[in-house]
Amino acid sequence: MGQEQGTPWIQSTGHTSTQKEEDGQKIPKLEHRNSTQLMGHYQKTMNQVAMPKQIVY
């Protein structure tokens, strides 16, 4: 069961990766904008979660 689920997932990921590369070349601005927004949100969330870790570090 695990192997059956894993095979299509790998294929799907590979296909998406290939498409993403082509899309990225066509519209890098859009992808970059999305990436920046995602990173900002991710950093905000990480800051809240990692704050106690930072103090220990």
Swiss-Prot record:
Q: Where is this region: Disordered?
A: 1-35
Q: Where in the cell is it found?
A: Host nucleus; Host cytoplasm, Host cytosol
A Gene Ontology CC term for this entry?
A: host cell cytosol
**Per UniProt, which keywords does this protein have?**
Host cytoplasm, Host nucleus
Sequence ranges of Polar residues compositional bias:
1-17
Cystine residue pairs: none
Q: Where is the composition biased (Basic and acidic residues)?
A: 18-34
GO terms in the biological process aspect are:
symbiont-mediated suppression of host cytoplasmic pattern recognition receptor signaling pathway via inhibition of MAVS activity
Anything else known: Is not encoded in all strains, and seems to be dispensable for replication.
Annotated family = Belongs to the influenza viruses PB1-F2 family.
Its biological purpose is as follows:
May play an important role in promoting lung pathology in both primary viral infection and secondary bacterial infection.
The name on file for this protein is Protein PB1-F2
Source organism:
Influenza A virus (strain A/USA:Texas/UR06-0195/2007 H1N1)
